[in-house]
């Protein structure tokens, strides 16, 4: 496959060793709000450790947190054992919610004639920098309207909930630049620190 966006650190299609270290609180807040909207808030809180429960109930957006707190959030959400369609929808909601942040600048590109998901995928490093520190992303062209998105150094990839919700996140963002988009994790290419998703659109 042709490389569309090389890994930033290596400048090639060879992934680096660069673990994610921090997550923006905006992602966790948005994820909690999406669960609350669906009536899972109390169950979610009950699954958190006491320390995380105290921190998450008073969390504000825009703060940088250790990625371990992101893991705590996704593991608690995973323990809810929600249907995959619900988890995908939660990921889509998170993408929609954070569009009110500087990411909206990229979204405005969708109003320009000729802009496609490929243009948005070219911004993957910059978009990722808004909410994560560390790790790296590489994107390949699997077809005229199909991409393979790989994120390395991401410990949250060890949580099934994250794999599905992040696919929903990518689906929603790609859909802003297309009539309809789909995204799913490629499980055989995922590891405890790597998430690989296939994105397609029409």
Give the predicted meaning of each segment.
Residues 59-165, 182, 187:
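Amphipathic interaction/junction segments at domain boundaries or subunit interfaces
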């Amino acid at each position: 496959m042709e490389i569309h966006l090389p890994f930033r650190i290596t400048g090639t299609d060879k992934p680096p060793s660069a673990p994610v270290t921090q997550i923006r609180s905006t992602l966790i807040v948005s994820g909690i709000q999406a669960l609350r909207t669906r009536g899972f808030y109390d169950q979610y809180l009950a699954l958190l450790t006491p320390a995380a429960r105290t921190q998450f109930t008073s969390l504000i957006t825009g703060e940088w947190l250790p990625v371990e707190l992101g893991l705590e959030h996704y593991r608690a959400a995973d323990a809810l054992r929600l249907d995959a369609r619900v988890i995908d929808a939660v990921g889509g909601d998170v993408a929609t919610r954070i569009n009110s942040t500087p990411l909206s600048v990229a979204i405005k590109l969708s109003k320009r004639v000729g802009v496609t998901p490929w243009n948005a995928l070219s911004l993957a490093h910059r978009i990722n920098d808004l909410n994560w520190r560390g790790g790296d992303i590489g994107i390949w062209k699997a077809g005229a309207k199909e991409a393979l998105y790989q994120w390395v150094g991401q410990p949250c990839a060890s949580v099934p909930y994250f794999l599905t919700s992040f696919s929903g996140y990518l689906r929603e963002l790609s859909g802003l630049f297309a009539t309809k988009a789909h995204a799913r994790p490629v499980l055989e290419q995922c590891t405890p620190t790597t998430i690989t998703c296939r994105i397609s659109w029409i």
